[in-house]
Amino acid sequence: MPDGVKHCGACLRHPPPLTRCLAAVDYGWPWRDLLARFKFDSHPGWAPHLAWLMQGSAWAEDTLHEADRVVPIPLSRERLAERGYNQSWLLARHLAPGKADASLLLRIRHTPAQRTLPRAERLANLEGAFAIEPLRAPQVRGQRLVLVDDVMTSGASLHTAARVLLQAGAAQVSAIVLARTGLGEDDQVQGEAT
């Protein structure tokens, strides 16, 4: 965005539920290929190094310091069994070891991979996919939460999860991702697969 512009036109028309969203790198070469390998080719050992990159994002240190909890975008049981690990949990655990909380937000419905869908269908795909762990719901009220994901393309996963957390009483929800597509690229990129 041009200097001095804080919000794009889309955000002005439909304000996102995130207080802020920080990204370490652009989701182009070589990051797209590296992230695909991290996520799909069983390279969980890369998580500490990728989290270190995320910590270097502008405002990341302040955002993590201010957070009460750092919450990874959860995978469905089916996707977790298929992949063997949740890449967002690995990143969150290394970003904020004392604040990472993988049991607060649940994926209660398996959905087709976001990367297989056009932008317009991504939000509908995730409707009802996330919920707060019922016994933990009181712990959300008044909390400043940070969602963690590896890639943000359309923002559907992060926005849907943020809305669930805000409806449960979170004071604010921000997000930190490793990579973000450029504005207007959401329909061409096929990378958000949580």
Question: How should each PLM-predicted stretch be described?
Answer:
Residues 1-194:
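Glycine-rich phosphate/pyrophosphate-handling loop used in enzymes and phosphotransfer proteins
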